[in-house]
Amino acid sequence: LYAPDVPVIGGGLFTKEYAEEHRAELERVYSMLADEKSKQVFDGWLEYRITGRIHPLLRNQTDKAEGYEILDLGGNETYADLGAYNGDTITEFLEVTGGQFNKIFAMEPDGKNYSKMKRIHYKLSPYDFRTVNAGAWSCDTVCEFISKGGRNSSLIPYEKGKPVNPSRIKEIEMRSLDSFVKDERITYIKYDVEGSESEA
């Protein structure tokens, strides 16, 4: 089974030649890994990126519980969920921390998803659970957005060249994480920011 790796943003493919050109950076990242499991996962990821074979990813697969175990989240986390969708990862976070946390900051640009998230987590205090119907960016601005009311909503550049229903294009507020959280110290961040990966 092959699953070629294609970039979500920007151009260029991750090939053997690319890996050779960036050998120093890749070796630097590898040297920062603290344990053998992390190094094994990195090697598998690198093999997948170059070959397109999915097996190197599958042999390093773990369940979500192990990931949360590694993160070692406690009851005093300040969590930023950028691209919060309907609040599904907020629900996971609350399960992992036993409902204990300092604050949660959630950004979601799609209006329907944002409403679902607010409805699902209506019991959380507005002081502890701060939300904004906006996308993540490097500064506060406005961008064009394709609203699809699901996981496929994205910024316009992500869809370039594909036919788009003009009624789905909306101008949306974009916020920087710093302007949204002010002086809060974030201890855990989740990014799922379709089309604004390099800017967020």
List the model feature ranges, each with a label.
Residues 1-200:
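Phosphate/nucleotide-binding beta-alpha loop and adjacent structural elements of enzyme active sites
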